[in-house]
Amino acid sequence: MLAPNYLDHAPDRLILLWQQAEDDILRDVARRIGKMDSLTPTANWQLWRYQQTEAVRKDVVKLLARYTGKSEAEIRRLMKEAATAALEAEDEIYYHYGKEPTPFEESTPLQNLLNAGYRQTAGSFSNLTATTANTVSGAFEQALDRAWLQVSSGAFDYKTAVKRAVDGLADSMPYVTYPSGHRDTLEVACRRAVLTGVNQTGAKLQEARMDEMGASFVEVTAHGGARPSHAVWQGRRYHRGGAVDYLGQHYEDFESATGYGTGAGLCGWNCRHTFFVVFPELGSPPAWTQESLEALNARDIEYDGRLYTRYEISQMQRARERAVRKWKRRYLAEDAAGADTTASAMKLRQARQSLADFTRATGGRVDSARTSVHGFGRSEASRAAWDVRHNTLTNAAGQTIIKVGKSDIKGPRNGITQKTNAKGGIDRNYYGADGRQTKQISNNGHGHKVEEALGKHGEHAHDYIFDATGRLIGRPSRELTDAERKENSDIL
């Protein structure tokens, strides 16, 4: 038997390995995209694009060769460790009831099952990584095409197009393609393949042990936050080989009740449940009662005025940890491409603060392994902090503002930028969730008659209006609201 918490963390070392591979690939791709600004409109775009795409494909193949050997060795180590842990826990039950199972190391059938599980798990993941070179180069090619179209159409300058392309790949570049056509990251594919392989191999070993010992009753483990289709059968007892009534108790059929043996059922895709042998005739008490199952999802942790289950709190923390990784990856990718890293540095600081505040409020602990990004060390952290200190400021409302050299109708999502205008005044640009500018606050009238007539000293606002295609169709000027005056009192 493998505990849900063991299964949750079993792939961690392997995931860290493939996260490093992802980060290496991303920086290489970003560096190549950054070379776009060296091209002229008359350059042979198609030839350059082909050369860069082929170079990415070859680089990915070389990098995968470096990681594959380490990956296979770690899968073998993990499978052996997990199998040993599963059978040690199971055999303790047999010993407790006076039974003598064959030692795992001396059992040829069990060793054969372990080796078969390793080959299947390593093989399935190897099949996925075999698609990585084409998946990554395809995503790179599409990003290049979008960036080139934005530049050649005049929609964006080189720097903006490069930054948008790099940020998009940092956030969502796929690395593997499943036979169904679904694409995913190496991290997600690794967790799914290894967690499923480890759990299924452990389950097959336990089944073989039960056959050896003539046992037929099992109890399924339970954990908080189980998906609804799994919550109905977790923590209960079943009979292998069909439903039975035994010693005044009804036992449902193990496979039909839990879906064991199917991808969507017990020990299936990403499932952290497993089972262990029980002997009702020998008086073995159930590990789970209805009360203890209900307690798994008790809302007993308070955060921000509401009560949450432990599972919900853990997922909220995971989301904040992913945000830290996201902005580290963006920072490194932008840095490799030679793009402006200020916005990412600022978002990283905010994400780190959000995670620290959350764990402090909920009594949790920051897991540095879940926020680490290969290549983002002390030096990068120091540079990111410098970016924030020297390229941002705070307004009267406590909002962080990015200092820029020029205004643009596209900017940081839900962000604010500031520049000095031609008349020596200050313009603050506000952006919505889609990165489009929503308004501009200026502390002077730019020397324009309409704006100079507004406010006390020409201070005014422009609202930005776009049509359905995203084209700017108007920026009417108006008086500042009381709230806007208060928020921007530091420049008025």
Name the predicted role of every residue range.
Residues 205-208, 296-302, 408-414, 430:
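Short, charged, low-hydrophobicity "junction" segments
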Residues 100-101, 105, 111-112, 202-209, ...:
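Intrinsically disordered, low-complexity boundary segments flanking structured domains
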Residues 1-165, 286-408, 438:
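N-terminal leader/targeting and assembly helices and adjacent pre-domain segments
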Residues 312, 390-492:
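Catalytic toxin/effector domains delivered as secreted proteins or via bacterial secretion systems
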Residues 184-291:
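Acidic, glycine-rich two-metal-ion catalytic cores of nucleic acid-processing enzymes
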Residues 285-298, 303, 475-492:
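Polybasic, low-complexity binding patches
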Residues 126-213:
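Contiguous, non-catalytic segments that form substrate-binding/exosite surfaces or channel walls
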